[in-house]
């Protein structure tokens, strides 16, 4: 019951936040005559793997409905699962991701231009065929590096960073990756440790650019990975 009440409260808070953002967008930016070209509102969601980015993204989708376009940053990974390059880089390293390509795509979508991009399938670790992406009034980019490049930060109108306490992050990541991605708990824990330095180097510093930081922390003790 407490969890349901917390979820309802969070949804209400999110709805109010979006209402304020939309009012600013509609009556501020879009009504300003100096903006000769209509631009769409870009929302960024950043944070480490397993912090709850997709959950927040789905909450935004529930609030905004078909006015929202979802873009997930994993589509910019340079290689599919099993490629030898993943022995040299982690997914958190910007050099292992086409972040400049992502920035160009976000810029195009903001300016109401159609793009073509692939998505990353976490079940089989492969990229989809190129898909035609038609921009919408609200666009959310969710991923590991949304605020890494200065030119992309300029294009994102509202930046949300999710800062989840580490024990909860590990718990959520284990539940997700064992259930939906076919990994063993041992493999997940090895992955977490191997990526920790890159998380500290490339992901955590993006928090300073956020307009809003969402923090999740435990209020009760729990066993990590136990459903």
Regions found by a protein language model. Name each.
Residues 2-36, 134, 175, 179, ...:
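NTP-dependent small-molecule kinase module
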Residues 56, 60:
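Hydrophobic positions on the alpha1 helix immediately C-terminal to the Walker A/P-loop
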Residues 69-70, 78-125, 138:
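Conserved nucleotide-sensing/catalytic segment adjacent to the nucleotide-binding pocket
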Residues 62-71:
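Post-Walker A helix-loop "phosphate-sensing" segment adjacent to the P-loop in P-loop NTPases
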Residues 53:
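Conserved lysine of the Walker
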Residues 49:
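The conserved Walker
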Residues 43-44:
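Short hydrophobic/aromatic beta-strand immediately N-terminal to the Walker A/P-loop
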Residues 128-181:
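ATP-dependent NMP and nucleoside kinases share a basic, alpha-helical "lid"
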């Amino acid at each position: 019951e407490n969890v349901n009440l917390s979820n309802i409260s969070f949804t209400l808070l999110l709805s109010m936040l979006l209402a304020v953002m939309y009012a600013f967008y509609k009556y501020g930016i879009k009504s300003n005559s100096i903006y000769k070209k209509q631009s769409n509102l870009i929302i960024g969601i950043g944070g480490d793997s397993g912090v709850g980015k997709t959950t927040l993204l789905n909450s935004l989708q529930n609030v905004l409905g078909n006015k929202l376009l979802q873009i997930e940053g994993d589509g910019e990974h340079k290689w599919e699962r099993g490629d030898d390059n993943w022995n040299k880089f982690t997914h958190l390293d910007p050099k292992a991701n086409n972040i400049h390509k992502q920035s160009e795509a976000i810029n195009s979508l903001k300016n109401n231009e159609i793009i073509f991009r692939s998505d990353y399938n976490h079940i089989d670790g492969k990229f989809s065929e190129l898909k035609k992406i038609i921009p919408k009034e609200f666009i959310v980019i969710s991923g590991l590096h949304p605020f890494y490049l200065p030119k992309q930060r300029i294009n994102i109108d509202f930046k949300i960073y999710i800062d989840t306490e580490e024990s909860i992050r590990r718990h959520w990541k284990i539940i997700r990756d064992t259930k939906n991605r076919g990994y063993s708990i041992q493999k997940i824990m090895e992955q977490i440790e191997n990526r920790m330095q890159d998380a500290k180097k490339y992901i955590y510093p993006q928090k300073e650019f956020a307009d809003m930081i969402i923090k999740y922390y435990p209020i009760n003790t729990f066993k990590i990975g136990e459903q």
